[in-house]
From Swiss-Prot:
Species of origin: Actinobacillus pleuropneumoniae serotype 3 (strain JL03)
Main location: cytoplasm
Domain comment quoted from the record: Consists of two distinct domains, a catalytic core and a N-terminal extension that is involved in tRNA binding.
Designated gene of the protein: serS
Top-level taxonomy: Bacteria, Pseudomonadati, Pseudomonadota, Gammaproteobacteria, Pasteurellales
Enzyme class: ligase
Binding site for L-serine: 241-243, 295, 395
Protein name as it appears in the record: Serine--tRNA ligase
Length: 435
């Protein structure tokens, strides 16, 4: 959620920036009308409160003099009723302003390139050279099925399309990837491993910005019947990413600035309805309703967040480098950024069967957009005032897509897969996966 003070002090500039950079039309007249109404009610409430306090003091003085105070009491009571009505009206207007703010995306950082979609993203760098094959390249589906390790038909039978069953050595390779990522981030990058719930409540999804705007992208549990007195009446939602529960660990907290930055990592399943993705990436593991990801989250002081974004992105890059997977780093343009992001880098891994780079990690600096929703603050020693923290998140990496990249980049002419060296300790020393 953007800072309400920006709308009070720089409404036209903010509206123009949102239009130019985000393609978002802010209803300026509604904002102005609500703000004028809020100001008037704020003044009225404060005036009535002051007058009521003064009258109350007069009652005490009159009572001490032995005077009849019934008229004064009635006056104070009436004023109290008027004050309560003004407070209710003020709360209602503030709620309307808040509701309006919830639909407004974050303002991009100045260095983010203008653009309408992913075709206008800016390539920053490349690492590694795509392998030149001397045989016909197979995609990960053909490779995985031939190795009896990927069973998409079983996924459909058990649930529906966009689900898969992994078996045998490929299931172990998938597990090895997640363990390798966690070990790297905790042992070399300074992250604290967390094990978080996969079901979360409304407040948690609101805090990181999934609700109210992106509810259709989530899987929600059905409201409970209420017939069992032991049931809770609150439905939950499956997490679309570990960013949601992990970032919310600091919700409603005041953090000692000396303890910043906080770095957390978690390996979780992720669940997405993929609303609006009908017909896209229907083959294979690229776009699933359920997939696993190792997430990185950082909570930092505001002045450190841009530096932290470079660091966090570098941590995701290190995974790809150690796996020997060619990739490119892309700075997203304004039209391709997430709703709450101020700046985002995507890492795109080379997939030989598609002869292109595909997203495998997205690393974002959210500034104080999430922190304002979560009331996540920090305070320096000796300071009376708190300030909002900045939050960052990034995939380190999406495990299923990393498996895709390993299968395709490390395939051999006979359909076997060479296990990357860094994964062999997690595979019991296995060097090559065969059928």
């Amino acid at each position: 959620m953007i800072d309400q003070n920006l709308l009070r002090t720089n409404l036209d500039d903010v509206a123009n920036a949102l239009k130019v950079k985000r393609g978002f039309t802010l209803d300026v007249e509604s904002v102005k009308a609500l703000e004028e109404k809020r100001k008037a009610l704020q003044v009225k409430t404060e005036t009535l409160q002051a007058e009521r306090n003064a009258r109350s003091k007069n009652i005490g003085a009159a009572k001490a003099r032995g005077e009849d105070i019934s008229a004064l009491l009635a006056e104070v009571d009436n004023m109290g009723n008027e004050l309560n009505e003004a407070k209710v009206a003020l709360d209602q207007v503030q709620a309307e302003i808040r509701e309006l703010l919830l639909s407004v995306p974050n303002l991009p950082a100045d260095e983010v390139p203008l653009g309408k979609d992913d075709t206008e993203n800016l390539e920053v760098s490349r690492w590694g050279e795509p392998r030149q094959f001397d045989f016909e390249v197979k995609d990960h589906v053909a490779l995985g099925e031939a190795l009896n390790g990927l069973d998409f038909a079983a996924g459909v039978k058990l649930t529906a399309s966009r689900f898969v069953v992994m078996k045998g050595k490929l299931a172990r390779l998938h597990r090895a990837l997640s363990q390798f990522m966690l070990d790297l981030h905790t042992e070399q990058h300074g992250y604290v491993e967390t094990n978080v719930p996969f079901l979360v409540n409304h407040d948690t999804l609101f805090g990181t910005g999934q609700l109210p705007k992106f509810g259709e992208d989530l899987f929600h549990t059905q409201p409970l019947t209420g017939q069992d007195p032991n049931e809770t009446q609150r439905p939950f939602s499956l997490i679309p990413t570990a960013e949601v529960p992990v970032t919310n660990l600091v919700r409603d907290e005041i953090i000692d600035e000396d303890s910043l930055p906080l770095r957390y990592t978690a390996h979780t399943p992720c669940f997405r309805s993929e609303a609006g993705s009908y017909g896209r990436d229907t083959r294979g593991l690229i776009r699933m309703h359920q997939f696993e990801k190792v997430e990185m989250v950082q909570i930092v002081a505001p002045e450190k967040s841009m530096e932290a974004l470079e660091e966090l992105t570098g941590h995701a890059e290190k995974v790809l480098q150690l796996l020997g997977l060619p990739y490119r780093k892309v700075l997203l343009c304004t039209g391709d950024m997430g709703f709450g992001s101020a700046k985002t880098y995507d890492l795109e891994v080379w997939l030989p069967a598609q002869n292109t780079y595909r997203e495998i990690s997205s690393c974002s600096n959210m500034w104080d957009f999430q922190a304002r929703r979560m009331s996540a603050r920090c305070k320096a020693k000796g300071d009376k005032k708190t300030r909002l923290v900045h939050t960052l998140n990034g995939s380190g990496l999406a495990v299923g897509r990393t498996l895709v990249a390993v299968l395709e980049n490390y395939q051999n002419a006979d359909g076997s897969i060479t296990v990357p060296e860094v994964l062999r300790p997690y595979m019991g020393g296995v060097e090559v996966i065969t059928a």
